Amino acid sequence: MVSVEEIRNAQRAEGPATVMAIGTATPPNCVDQSTYPDYYFRITNSEHMTELKEKFKRMCDKSMIKKRYMYLNEEILKENPSVCAYMAPSLDARQDMVVVEVPKLGKEAATKAIKEWGQPKSKITHLIFCTTSGVDMPGADYQLTKLLGLRPSVKRYMMYQQGCFAGGTVLRLAKDLAENNKGARVLVVCSEITAVTFRGPTDTHLDSLVGQALFGDGAAAVIVGSDPLPVEKPLFQLVWTAQTILPDSEGAIDGHLGEVGLTFHLLKDVPGLISKNIEKALVEAFQPLGISDYNSIFWIAHPGGPAILDQVEAKLGLKPEKMEATRHVLSEYGNMSSACVLFILDQMRKKSIENGLGTTGEGLDWGVLFGFGPGLTVETVVLRSVTV
């Protein structure tokens, strides 16, 4: 007869959760940011709004984005004029697209991660799927299980409508699953498609235009597990996680799903709120490790927009190279909501290895991953790099 304590001990992994593989994917349609304002105002039949177009051009110029990838192309938009209006009933048209395309793009990223991991997919015990693009039952987690041919007994977690902080949320959840279930291998997938948020311009809601200038499509997948086998290659350890709602930030970022699709509202000084509270989050995370110099750690921050990164840098006195991987992803892909931080994780380990920097985290041992989004919610993940 075994005790409950013995059962519990047998269930737990010994070491910390570890990221073992990363895969990313985008739709084939690539959009150049410099020509996007002309295209956007033409496709939405808004060319008469000349002043607004100039404002939008300035937004795109200041965005620090070179290009983005979008499932929505000219052909699809011409077939779905309701999606091009600012406020037309269009949810059915949007749902028809994303319910199919979100799991499909997720599959592409997951297939790359599984290939890098090098283990049979039958060893995947848990699946976390995260998207802010569309809602369905059974969900995108079920569709991906079918698309990949995972075991029917895989334990699934579906996270809908979390928003831009959720790249941190999925790692927090994956850590808890991996460390509390011996031998667990968690497939994490974030897949985002802007077909649910795309809409024409209006001069009454400029915050809607900000989203049109920043958002792009992408999917990222990671495999997380504890106690790596000799055949598995650890990339980063997930050491500590936290989630918090910032004080006095209610209504700072809102998203509402309705007949017109998903509408976003930025109501307060988001960069200011984040930069004002970032140090508190870092102290809580790094004081136990005796780290107070935030230039001595590597950085992965959700690139909500350039102003957030600029103000965080200024507040903490960060060297420009600290945000290099983050700014690279913003420049090459735009803001892909929950998938962004996983793209940055991928970029960082690739560049670190290419440049012979000694660890997956730019030659440094410790790092931080931040997610920022609706709430205002902040996710903090303390990472430990792996020697390469």
UniProtKB/Swiss-Prot annotation:
Pfam families to which the protein is assigned, alphabetical: Chal_sti_synt_C (PF02797), Chal_sti_synt_N (PF00195)
Catalytic activity: (E)-4-coumaroyl-CoA + 3 malonyl-CoA + 3 H(+) = 2',4,4',6'-tetrahydroxychalcone + 3 CO2 + 4 CoA
Family annotation (Gene3D superfamilies): 3.40.47.10
Keyword annotations from UniProtKB, A to Z: Acyltransferase, Flavonoid biosynthesis, Transferase
GO molecular function: acyltransferase activity, transferring groups other than amino-acyl groups; naringenin-chalcone synthase activity
InterPro entries on file: Chalcone/stilbene_synt_C, Chalcone/stilbene_synt_N, Chalcone/stilbene_synthase_AS, Polyketide_synthase_type-III, Thiolase-like
Active site: 164
Domain of life of the organism encoding this protein: Eukaryota
EC number: 2.3.1.74
Transmembrane segments: none
GO biological process, one term: flavonoid biosynthetic process
Pathway: Secondary metabolite biosynthesis; flavonoid biosynthesis
Family: Belongs to the thiolase-like superfamily. Chalcone/stilbene synthases family.
Function: The primary product of this enzyme is 4,2',4',6'-tetrahydroxychalcone (also termed naringenin-chalcone or chalcone) which can under specific conditions spontaneously isomerize into naringenin.
Protein name, as recorded: Chalcone synthase 3
